[in-house]
Amino acid sequence: AYLIAVTDRITHLSKGDLGHSAISGTPVLDELVQHMPPTLTLLACGAGLALAVGLPLGLLFAFGAIRRIAAPFMQIATATPLFCAGLAFAYGAVQLLHWPVSVNMRVGLAVPPDQALRLAALPIATVGLAGAAAVQLALRRAAARSSGEAFRTGLKRLGLSGMEIEFLYVMPQIIAGLLASAGEIALALVSAAVVAEWVFNRQGAADLFVQSVALADWNMTAVILFAFACLTIVTGFFGRIAGYLLAREEMA
């Protein structure tokens, strides 16, 4: 009976039948296509905020004594549970700004532009700040690796100042290290999106993933997990290629 069930399942998979969602009863691929655009939009906006915040912080804390002073504080900040940060954002928005953060944003629901902006601001901030922590960590890690490079001594003997060495030779290596960490940053953004969509009741693919796990809907869970894994792997792959090409061009 087990072999028959496995054979039957493989036959359905070969035909593109991945099962049906336990939540809506629709095919899992249709459910994924319906819920993925809001999550991709959240990830894109969060990535933009992560770069806008993480790049200046990472570069500020990447050089000299500032890196050593800021290291323990940044470790504490990055270790803060994202769930707690999301709840803090929600509490501040309700108590201080009087924003409606608990409205259930259903797919296809039309809302006024100002309300849509308020509903989107907190999830984007949650995802963006989580991504910013990953960005600045990648920059500081790349700066720490480049701080012991042997070419610094040779360049100083050629008459270059420390500032020229940092910006002309070290900075490209740091940016290359950031690009090489694109997969880790994407993983941080996806993880933050799961928390943000669940805390702020946004019905995207990340929230659907949480619901599917709770209902033991493993067909839906596997498809969403595969989509997120592909997104992270592809981002990391192209990021590593870009980082390698940038570092190679600089060394040439």
Question: What do these predicted regions represent?
Answer:
Residues 74-130:
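Generic hydrophobic transmembrane alpha-helix motif, especially the helices
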Residues 22-28, 105-108, 226:
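Short linear capping/connector segments at secondary-structure termini
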Residues 32-68, 82, 111-252:
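Alpha-helical transmembrane segments of integral membrane proteins
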Residues 20, 97, 197-198:
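Flexible, active-site-adjacent loop/turn segments at secondary-structure boundaries
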Residues 13-17, 96-100, 146, 189:
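A short secondary-structure junction motif
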Residues 1-51:
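An internal, D/E-rich "acidic patch" concept
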